[in-house]
Amino acid sequence: AAGAKLGKQQAGTFGDAAGFSFYPTKNLGALGDGGAVVTDDEQLADTVRAIANYGSEVKYENKFSGLNSRMDEIQAGILSVKLKYLDDDNTKRKGIAQYYLNHINNPEIILPEIINRKSDSHVWHLFVIQHEMRDELAKYLKARGVQTIINYPICLPLLPAYSRLKHHENDFPIASRHQKQILSLPIFPEITDEQIKHVCNSIKEFFVEKNTYIR
């Protein structure tokens, strides 16, 4: 959500602290795994820095049970350069998302909905559609050179880590339905206009071949 706003407030300024992922596919991404914690609390910042450095503020004097979560200089340098282009890249993402919203006009497809307030700024890390024939559509698009992905294919309560709680799909009917229908379309600043059109046309062709309604 780097660069997103709710009203006049930037993402990362809600609460005592916030975390940003710098995974390569994020809006502000490094060339490998990385992330940051932001806060305006100096004491909390010192604690987080120590935890990320084996739990020590002074070498070999471990104040906390910590981790090795320090970002290396190469990744930091790359992010420093990419940060200059974040607003421009987010503007491109918004344009791509708007094209999808305007041209994927099959009523059988559930498109993402946002509250359209001028003071807010959605930065479209993902563009996720939903359809009950998700797997067939993904296979069809792949055959036409369109890479899609299923982000978070298992809802949290059904993960093996929580099997001890003995949850069932019926306990979470909405989340369980979504996990079977969600599909993320390509959205990144470098995608070309022709590639975006190809994505939309391929989706239309899929439904034409399936003899389902499409305008």
Locate predicted features.
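Conserved PLP phosphate-binding loop immediately N-terminal to the Schiff-base lysine helix
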Residues: A1-F14, A18-S21
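Glycine-rich phosphate-binding loop of ATP-grasp-fold ATP-dependent ligases
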Residues: N27, L31-A36
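Hydrophobic transmembrane-helix microenvironments that flank and shape a buried ionizable site
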Residues: T13, A30, S69-R70
